[in-house]
């Protein structure tokens, strides 16, 4: 694996053809309209893309370590247990402490592409 990789991110967003997209499997709470692609990693950081269609949902989940999500395209809400929600839009960056339950809900007609990075060891442990 190379230490660096260029992903096209022009005016139309990330080139979806650079990755192998995998639909998220429903867990206890169903995910729908969501796909995940692993782009690779270097220096202990894994890079993933999450595609969330308008109205799509990524079910509530946790990551073992801190995770950072940059919203590349689209918008929606992050939801938490107890009903709390945070709205997000293109250009926002959201950080989650480890083991904080949260989920994603697409809100616009556009597809959301989010780039998420977190320690590679936590990705392997969760798999």
Question: Where do the protein language model's features map onto the residues?
Answer:
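A short, N-terminal "cap"/entry segment at the start of jelly-roll beta-barrel domains
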Residues: 1-44, 48, 59, 126-127
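Short, charged/polar surface micro-motifs in flexible loops or helix N-caps
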Residues: 42-45, 53-56, 75-77, 120-123
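A cytosolic small-molecule/anion-sensing beta-strand core signal
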Residues: 49, 72-73, 89-90
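Catalytic core of non-heme Fe(II) oxygenases with the double-stranded beta-helix
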Residues: 53-62, 67
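Short beta-strand His + acidic residue motifs that chelate non-heme Fe in jelly-roll/DSBH
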Residues: 58-60, 78-79, 96, 101-108
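Glycine- and acidic-residue-biased ligand/ion/polar-headgroup-sensing regions
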Residues: 64-77, 81
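A short hydrophobic beta-strand segment most commonly corresponding to one strand
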Residues: 68, 95, 109-125
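Short acidic-glycine-tyrosine-enriched beta hairpin
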Residues: 82-99
């Amino acid at each position: 694996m190379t230490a660096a990789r260029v992903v096209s991110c022009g005016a139309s967003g990330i080139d979806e053809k650079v990755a192998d997209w995998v639909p998220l499997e429903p867990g206890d709470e169903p995910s729908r309209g969501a796909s995940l692609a692993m782009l690779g990693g270097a220096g202990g950081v894994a890079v993933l893309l999450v595609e969330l269609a308008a109205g799509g949902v990524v079910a509530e989940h946790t990551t073992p370590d801190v995770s950072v999500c940059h919203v590349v395209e689209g918008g929606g809400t992050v939801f938490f247990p107890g009903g709390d929600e945070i709205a997000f839009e293109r250009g926002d960056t959201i950080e989650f402490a480890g083991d904080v339950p949260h989920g994603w809900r697409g809100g616009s007609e556009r597809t959301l592409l989010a780039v998420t990075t977190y320690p590679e060891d936590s990705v392997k442990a969760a798999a």
